[in-house]
Amino acid sequence: QPPTDPPAGRRGTLAATVRTGFDAPYGGNPRGVTTTSQEELFRFLEDRFACAQACTECARACATRAGLVDPDGAENQELVRRKGIMCAEVCDATCRVLSEQNQADEATIRMQVEWCRQVCLESAQVFDGHPGAERTAEACRACARACTAFLDTLN
């Protein structure tokens, strides 16, 4: 219900017309805003941390893999090197976005995590075709799964 008019003797005063906190007309929250259960908050934080951790592990694995590839090697080695560098950079940037406290809005976080998920899946496919890169491909898939879980939490 909308707020009622202030008492006749107090009309025109700010104190009579502005109510905040739990005395506000809508229970302390702006219209359309609901409270989040403690369980939902814990799940959000756990999934966010798990995603950031998986991004860190993937970035490390991809940077290592890129460093092991001969820069003057065959064309497929150059692709592995480029994908490794790109995936490491995207995962590192995603970890930084997830680690910042309220520095990015939800749309920015969602876009960054989705981009990371896509790059990880593409990189895993490239690493699958490169002997010795199986662990790196698995790190990429684990990161993509963590990104998917976090995106599910945001929905």
Which residues are covered by each model-predicted region?
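Compositionally biased, low-complexity flexible segments
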Residues: 2-20
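Amphipathic alpha-helical hairpins
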Residues: 18-155
